[in-house]
Amino acid sequence: MSLKSIVRELREMRDGIGSMSRRAADGRAGGGRGGSRHSWPVLWSEQQQPPQQQQLQRQEHQQQQGRWANLPPELLLDVIQRVEASEATWPARRQVVACAAVCRSWREVTKEVVKTLEECGRITFPISLKQPGPREHPVQCFVRRDRATSTYLLYLGLSPSLHGENDKLLLAARKIRRATRTSFVISLVSNDFSLSSSTYVGKLKPNFLGTKFTIFDSQPPCDAVVLPNNRPSKRHFKQVSPRLPLGNYNVATVSYELTVLRNRGPRRMQCTMHSIPALCIQEGGKAPTPTGIIHSLDEQVPALSTSKGKEPAIEFSSTSLSADLSGPVCTNEVPLVLKNKAPRWHEQLQCWCLNFRGRVTVASVKNFQLVASVDPSLGIPAAEQEKVILQFGKIGKDIFTMDYRYPLSAFQAFAICLTSFDTKPACE
């Protein structure tokens, strides 16, 4: 039997597994693309379900999986390795996700075979969006902007395909306008931006002038000190899953330089990545790399005292987990700071220019490249400091490219790029 036949049979079997899982998938907005269990939002939400519900689903799955759940480990490993090696790009890559959805044993083997994004350079599971990109080459993506709905869609690939059928959606964001403020809500799907949804992955909040932005992650980063903020967030939940952490986690701050004289020129920005240590970019350094969804805040940090109906906004420092949440910020490691790569003025074109290596074709104030800004005392090689970690630029009407690499994740890079779309009266 060929590998494609095996995967096809697995998908047919998977579609018939468990009316409970089907009802769970159909009940979630955005998770019903064909109702398949291997869709990203469903896999994300399944890992955040209560233990009792997961146990019931596992028992039901075991009764219906038959011979596939009892394959010899050596054969199972060989099958998944072959599928992983042959299906390297999307949409064929969904076959690897299908293998992880067969049963618990298949999922464990698939998790062993599929390496982190930094190691293999391939985006496979939703957790890949929170992992650092590869070191040797950037992950190339593009962003579509819908002005009518203030929606921004991040896709994997060099540029949009002709009909868009094979474009792999990674993340979606929507600009939410309030009476006194605005924010960007980031989700796994393009039709559900509820803060209480299982597809919610984070948000971006600007200040009034549009000069400072705070990036909040829905999950606490690994290897971080948690420091409660005195001003709790005002997000209210109608119904909160016991597996979801009650908090937004301040993982980065993006600041734009205030332009008093309103002189024309490129925007100047600085990104402080609170959850990434600066030393991670040196040879042998390691950025925090999550390998699975964190099920509950209680598994990582002690409970935080909150006001009724409110949740704490939590800040991080790039150090080991601390039990004393009320103490001062522990700064054993300096956070990574990113800055604009200095452009050059082109006399003939009469504009500021950067070498985007063909990935940006339209001049725009939104175009930028970010490199590391480190203290000389840290001993980071000059070559590492010159590497472009994130670049963003325009290629057409409402279409932009976004290329990122280690140590940024897709979520962090996308959130930084979203700051370019907000109004900045004090910076222009």
Curated annotation (Swiss-Prot):
SUPFAM superfamilies: F-box domain, Tubby C-terminal domain-like. Residues 65-117 form the F-box domain. It holds the Pfam family F-box-like. InterPro entries: F-box-like_dom_sf, F-box_dom, Tubby-like_C, Tubby_C, Tubby_C_CS. It comes from the Eukaryota. Residues 17-65 are annotated as: Disordered. Ubiquitous. Residues 47-65 have a biased composition (Low complexity). Belongs to the TUB family. PANTHER family: TUBBY-LIKE F-BOX PROTEIN 6, TUBBY-RELATED. This is Tubby-like F-box protein 5. It comes from Oryza sativa subsp. japonica (Rice). The lineage of its organism: Eukaryota, Viridiplantae, Streptophyta, Embryophyta, Tracheophyta. The gene is TULP5.
